[in-house]
């Protein structure tokens, strides 16, 4: 009989711990952004990188994706901050200001969706933990 009362209490406590961990993950993810810089005239590969990054980010709905036109003068400060003067892909932590350049990975794997998503997610998971 005593176990009958302890089981619901234990289950409730477990749910609280699990939901708190999920909130911590969401808070961490909300400080991360994925930013793709591009020039005015975009090539097929640049468009494909955008498409694949958006597909990969479906696993992380709290992480925003943004496109920045590197040729637009209003984006000059941001381009300088990231040293992005053409097509490039970055992970950015708004809290720590840490930047991870994924440009080489993106261009190397743009032709293979599965490999791109695997490498992108691996990099993003590592970035989230740092």
Task: Mark where each language-model region is.
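Bacterial N-terminal signal peptides
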Residues: 7-17
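Non-catalytic, surface beta->alpha helical segment in thiol-disulfide oxidoreductase systems
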Residues: 91-130
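Thiol-based oxidoreductase modules, predominantly thioredoxin-like and allied folds used
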Residues: 62-75
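Structural micro-motif
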Residues: 79-92
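Sec/Tat signal peptide C-region and signal peptidase I cleavage site
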Residues: 20-24
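Local sequence-structure signature of Cys/Sec-based thiol-disulfide redox active-site neighborhoods
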Residues: 27-57
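Positively charged n-region of N-terminal signal peptides that target proteins for export
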Residues: 1-6
